Swiss-Prot record:
Keyword DNA-binding listed: no
The entry's keywords: Calmodulin-binding, Coiled coil, Cytoplasm, Cytoskeleton, Nucleus, Phosphoprotein
Protein's UniProt keywords contain Cell wall biogenesis/degradation: no
A single cellular component GO annotation: new mitotic spindle pole body
Lineage, top ranks: Eukaryota, Fungi, Dikarya, Ascomycota, Taphrinomycotina
Name used for this protein in its record: Spindle pole body protein pcp1
Organism: Schizosaccharomyces pombe (strain 972 / ATCC 24843) (Fission yeast)
Length: 1208
């Protein structure tokens, strides 16, 4: 895994303001300043030792100081520490030259895991909770230069990638299942033949399930909508019936009340004369009753307003449902686009398969040619001692086999052409799917237009509701006015209440009309929903049909793949052998590496042992030398004592001294013997170590040789892989070139005048290809004859170079004569006679081969003539091509025969002896001619392969052009059908517009009639009120005039709606005329810009996208592992520091030294320090972001306020 450095990205806290964060950071900074003097020394002890903070590299070394760190904790601590000489810029960027952390190895990760699992003293959630609310703000899935994601952010990104690449996962699963049952050498072919088809089938099934689920959801939604509509209609009916009943009852009640009031008025007029004192009391009572009745009327108006609000809510819900339907239709379009992309991928895969089959046929032909050459060599070596009849028989069998192989190859080519035809059918169906997609798009546009019309209707309903609200306001004002009048005159109040009741009844009638209109609109919406459901059902049926057709095609391709598996099985064994050898080489490398490590370890141990032994020897030598000196001193003393005793033998005390000295000497001698034994043992061990070292060195040399051999194998395998990759690149380049040629050919094909010339050129190229194929076959036969001659000449060269005696002995053994009685000249004459016989047999064989070849070429000429007739060539060109072919072959055969005759009919060979110098020169001449012929053969073979490729490409081009013509004809028919459907839709739309226009005119007439009635009624009321004209009556007149103005405004609004409808009708007519002109242009000008390059660009884009996604997944996986390990490593270091401090304190306590309690209390832990520093830095960074967010909120609030004021 590559080593990378990262910068932290500050998380965004949700429930905090910028001012609160600033206050927290200030508080933490002050608390740190107060304790800074106490723990500075404690922190410096750790910071001065930079090796303690460095993480180990993968190979055990340390990273240089210039690299950036990759964890949020250490980076923030380094930024706030003065010991690292780091500097933060204006944007808070860290100076990497101050200090950095290096990458981390796998062993360190395992140690960190073991330590973190064993130690529960540190809670990881305290650190990870800081990054919970971090957001991912990256573009195009790539990380910025100075950012590092947390684990949860990485998980979110991975979830997005997994959702986007669900199809890739399915392909991977299918590949793994298939690879378990296949040989490793057939992986590429299997992936391209079977696995991708299964994956695409799974994708199609998933798409089916999704579409079915969407359809079920849409059906459920439609069913719910229908239920809601039914329920609303029932509710409206019930409410209308209830409202009618309530209003009728109220009207009757009010009429009865009015009658009662009038009766009471008559009674009051009689009673006024009798009892004037009670009149005022009765008046007040009646006024109160009238006020109560007015309150009841106001309550009824409130109920009507509530009903209006409920209907507005229902209209809003219907609008939402319409928008949801639009969203569902957009989702359906996206699914259709995805299916379209998958079909394009199918097309690219099948095209790649065709190219692979063509390459495979070329490889098989090359292998067959090589096998033929090897067979010819073996048969020529074996046929030296055989008879002429056996040679003829074997040559005939070889020719028969070669013909069978050629026929087999032709059959394979025909199969490939059939597969290409199937592929063409798939392309036609694919284009039909595109056409259906366009039709669906047009249908969706019509639906959008219908939705727009519904929106306009809803807007008109909203305007009507607003007008009703204004009327309600006017009614409220009139009620207030009535209350004022009731306080002054009861008679006037009664008259006004009567008038107002009549107006209320009229308004109730208008409300009923509006309710009926709303019900009609609901009915229309229900019909539209039913139409949408029918359209969705038709679309699902079409999709099911297409899916069934695709499944049938997939089954047919599976059958073809099963037939091709027979050819694939032959190559599996080769791949298995190569992979086994590769695995053996890699295992051997591993074993050898382990043995080398062990060997180095044993050598190091032996060297250490040798050093120990040498040190022991030196020590023992020093001891021996010291002991020898002491022994010499003691012997001298002994001799001196003996001399002294010999002089004074009578002294008994001296005898005791002698015994003591003898004991000392015996002890020293024993020590000497022990030292000598130890030296002998050490020397033996040293010799054994030397022998073991020699054995190990020998084994090391063997291992190094084996390692070199394995490295050579590994390099050879690596070169083979590189060659395979180069071949793939070449194939891709050839594909791109072919695609360019196809695009050019399509452009050229679009012109009608250039078609005849291009057909002629294609015919000429086909004739040339046929000639070259015939020449190649003749050259193959010539090659076989030349191989035979080369073999004989090489044998003669070998015999000429051998010494005369060896030649004589071998010739005598071959001829069956004695070595002493026969001379060299006689043996040479016999050999020449045998060679002449062989030449005659070769000539007879050549004649037979020519006869057979003439028959075979006759058949081929017939086939060529048929091909010429297909392409429209004449007989003259055919005879010219065949004559040139025969001339070339005859010239090459004559050259070979002349060279052989010159060699065998030389004057020296006639005399019976051939000098070695002349012999070598002639042989060199023949070798040169043979090499020239070989080069010519190779050139012809290359030209043949190129011509075969050109033939296949031209055949493909012709088929594609024919398909294109068919597709254009179909497209034309589809456009005609669309025009007809559009005309029918336009006619229906015109009829609908006319009906709407008539309805609006009728409605205008009705409104005008109502206005006339209202004006008449108003005039009558004015005549009645002229007798009692007061200030209050003038106010009433003003209110009535305002009501008239509102009605006139409504009339103006309806007239504007009519004008809008007329304008829309004109715009639709203009669009219809434009479409008609466009259709005429399409008929006159055929589509020159085809979508030929589109498929290739899309295929390339998809391949690049898959590679990018694979690299992205790998990169994210590596990032996740590195981040997890870095966190665990930091935790390990922190726990290590804590444990070290605890151990040191315990040691000091055991010794008896205890630190001051003040110091221990004021010391701050490294863990808490890091957390505080991180929080301060993050809050500082978040300050600017929160300020920006606050500014944005303020600007949005201002914009909303402006919008509200503009609406009002």
């Amino acid at each position: 895994m590559s080593e990378r450095d990262f910068n932290t990205q500050s998380p965004k806290f949700k429930d905090e303001n910028a001012n609160s964060v600033i206050s927290q950071s200030d508080f933490l900074g002050k608390s740190l300043k107060n304790n800074n003097d106490d723990y500075s020394d404690f922190r410096g002890s750790y910071l001065n030792d930079k090796s303690s903070f460095q993480t180990p590299l993968r190979n055990g070394s340390y990273q240089p100081k210039g690299s950036l760190e990759f964890t949020p904790l250490l980076q923030s601590s380094n930024k706030n520490s003065d010991k690292y000489n780091g500097s933060l810029g204006d944007k808070g960027s860290f100076d990497p030259n101050s200090y950095g952390l290096s990458a981390i190895s796998k062993q360190a990760t395992q140690e960190a895991l073991s330590i973190s699992q064993g130690n529960d003293s540190y809670d990881v959630s305290k650190l990870t909770d800081l990054s919970k609310n971090s957001e991912i703000d990256h573009t195009d899935g790539e990380l910025p230069a100075n950012a590092a994601l947390t684990l949860r952010e990485q998980e979110k990104v991975l979830e997005k990638v997994s959702r986007e690449n669900f199809g890739l996962r399915i392909k991977i699963v299918c590949l793994e299942k298939r690879l378990e049952s296949m040989a490793p050498e057939q992986i590429k072919e299997a992936v391209k033949d079977n696995v991708e088809l299964h994956a695409e089938r799974a994708n199609l099934q998933l798409q089916l399930k999704r579409t079915e689920s969407l359809l079920q959801k849409s059906e459920d939604k439609n069913f719910k909508l229908e239920e809601k509509v039914d329920y609303l209609s029932k509710v409206n009916d019930v409410e209308q019936s209830q409202n009618v009943k309530v209003f009728t009852e109220r009207i009757r009640f009010l009429e009865n009340a009015l009658e009662k009031v009038q009766r009471e008025k008559d009674s009051l007029s009689t009673e006024m004369e009798e009892d004037k004192s009670n009149k005022e009391v009765d008046y007040e009572y009646e006024i109160r009753q009238l006020q109560n009745r007015l309150d009841e009327l106001s309550e009824e108006l409130d109920v009507a307003q509530d009903l209006l609000t409920e209907k507005e809510d229902e209209i809003a819900t219907l609008k939402r449902q319409i928008e949801e339907k639009e969203n569902s239709s957009s989702a359906f379009e996206n699914e259709e686009n995805s299916s379209y992309v998958h079909l394009q991928e199918d097309y690219a895969i099948l095209q790649a398969k065709c190219d692979e089959f063509a390459d495979r046929i070329q490889v098989l032909t090359a292998d067959l040619e090589k096998e033929k050459e090897n067979q010819i060599m073996h048969e020529s070596e074996a046929s030296i001692g055989l008879t002429d009849s056996m040679q003829v028989h074997t040559l005939q069998e070889q020719l028969h086999k070669a013909n069978e192989e050629i026929e087999f190859l032709h059959d394979q080519i025909s199969r490939m052409n059939e597969e290409g035809k199937n592929f063409e059918d798939i392309m036609l169906q694919f284009r039909s799917l595109e056409e259906e997609r366009d039709v669906l798009e047009s249908k969706l546009q019509t639906l959008e237009d219908d939705n727009n019309s519904l929106r306009l209707m809803t807007s008109s309903l909203g305007n009507q509701i607003e007008s009703l609200r204004t009327q309600n306001r006017e009614i409220d004002e009139e009620k207030n006015h009535l209350r004022l009048l009731a306080s002054k005159n009861s008679d006037k109040a009664l008259a006004e209440t009567n008038i107002r009741l009549q107006e209320v009844t009229k308004e109730l009638e208008t409300l009923r009309m509006k309710n009926s209109n709303d019900l009609n609109e609901i009915h229309d919406l229900r019909e539209e929903n039913e139409g949408l459901t029918l359209k969705i059902d038709s679309i699902t049926k079409e999709k099911d049909r297409l899916i069934n057709e695709l499944e049938q095609r997939i089954k047919s391709y599976e059958v073809n793949v099963s037939e091709l598996n027979g050819t694939i099985d032959e190559y599996r064994n080769k791949l298995k052998d190569k992979e086994e050898t590769y695995n053996e080489v890699m295992n051997a490398f591993q074993y050898k590496d382990n043995d080398l490590r062990r060997f180095h370890e044993s050598i190091n141990k032996l060297q250490d042992r040798e050093k120990e032994l040498t040190s022991n020897l030196e020590k023992k030598n020093l001891v021996i030398s010291s002991l020898r000196e002491t022994v010499a001193m003691l012997e001298k003393e002994r001799e001196s004592i003996k001399k002294y005793l010999s002089g004074n033998a009578k002294d008994l005390d001296n005898t005791n001294l002698m015994e003591i000295l003898n004991d000392k000497i015996s002890v020293l001698q024993r020590q000497l013997t022990d030292v000598k034994d130890e030296l002998d043992v050490s020397e033996e061990e040293r010799e054994e170590a030397i022998v073991a070292g020699q054995k190990l060195s020998a084994s090391f040399e063997l291992m190094s040789n084996e390692k070199q051999a394995l490295e050579l194998k590994y390099s050879s395998l690596k070169n083979e892989l590189i060659n395979a990759q180069n071949l793939l690149d070449r194939r891709e380049e050839e594909l791109s070139e072919l695609s360019k040629k196809l695009f050019e050919e399509r452009k050229i094909r679009s012109g009608s005048n250039d078609d005849i010339e291009k057909n002629k050129e294609i015919n000429v190229l086909n004739s040339e290809l046929a000639d070259k194929l015939a020449q190649i076959r003749h050259l193959e036969s010539d090659k076989m004859e030349l191989d035979k001659l080369v073999h004989h000449l090489n044998r003669g060269i070998e015999e000429a170079n051998i010494e005369e005696n060896a030649v004589k002995k071998r010739l005598c053994l071959l001829m069956g004569c004695d070595y002493s009685s026969v001379s060299i000249l006689q043996i040479v004459s016999q050999i020449e006679h045998f060679v002449n016989q062989q030449i005659q047999t070769i000539r007879s064989l050549k004649q037979e081969l020519r006869h057979d070849f003439v028959q075979f070429s006759g058949k081929k000429e017939q086939e060529l003539s048929r091909s010429f007739e297909k392409f429209g060539l004449g007989t003259e060109t055919k005879h010219d091509i065949l004559a040139q072919r025969n001339r070339n072959v005859s010239e090459k055969m004559n050259d070979l025969e002349n060279a052989a005759q010159k060699f065998f009919s030389s004057p020296d060979r006639k005399n019976g002896y051939l000098y070695p110098s002349e012999h070598t020169s002639k042989i060199e001449y023949l070798e040169k001619t043979i090499e020239d012929l070989k080069l010519a053969l190779q050139d012809e073979l290359k030209n043949r392969n190129l011509l075969m490729d050109d033939i296949s490409s031209y055949n493909k081009q012709t088929t594609k052009l024919q398909e294109k013509i068919k597709w254009l004809e179909r497209e034309r028919s589809i456009l005609i059908d669309e025009l007809e459907s559009y005309r029918s839709n336009q006619f229906n739309y015109q009829n609908n517009l006319v009906q709407d226009k008539n309805e609006l005119e009728e409605r205008l007439k009705e409104i005008q009639k109502e206005l006339e009635v209202y004006n008449n009624h108003f005039m009558k009321q004015a005549e009645l009120m002229t007798s009692n004209v007061t200030d209050e009556s003038q106010l009433m007149l003003k209110t009535l005039r305002e009501a008239l103005q509102s009605k006139t405004n409504n009339i103006d609004h309806l007239s504007t709606i009519l004008e809008r409808n007329r304008k829309e009708y004109k715009s639709l007519l203009d669009d219809y005329n434009q479409l008609r002109a466009r259709y005429k242009n399409l008929q006159s000008n055929t589509p020159q810009s085809t979508q030929s390059g589109q498929y290739e660009s899309e295929i390339k884009g998809l391949s690049k996208l898959t590679k990018y996604l694979q690299s992205k997944c790998r990169r994210e996986h590596s990032l996740r592992l590195d981040l997890a390990f870095s966190k665990k490593f930091i935790l390990m270091q922190l726990t290590g520091y804590e444990t070290c401090n605890k151990i040191n304190l315990r040691m000091l306590q055991k010794i008896g030294i205890s630190p001051d309690p003040d110091l221990s209390k004021k010391h701050i832990k490294l863990k808490s320090l890091i957390i505080v520093v991180c929080s301060i830095e993050r809050m500082k960074r978040m300050k600017n972001e929160w300020l920006k967010q606050a500014q944005l909120k303020q600007s949005l609030q201002r914009a909303a306020a402006k919008a509200k004021t503009a609406n009002y």
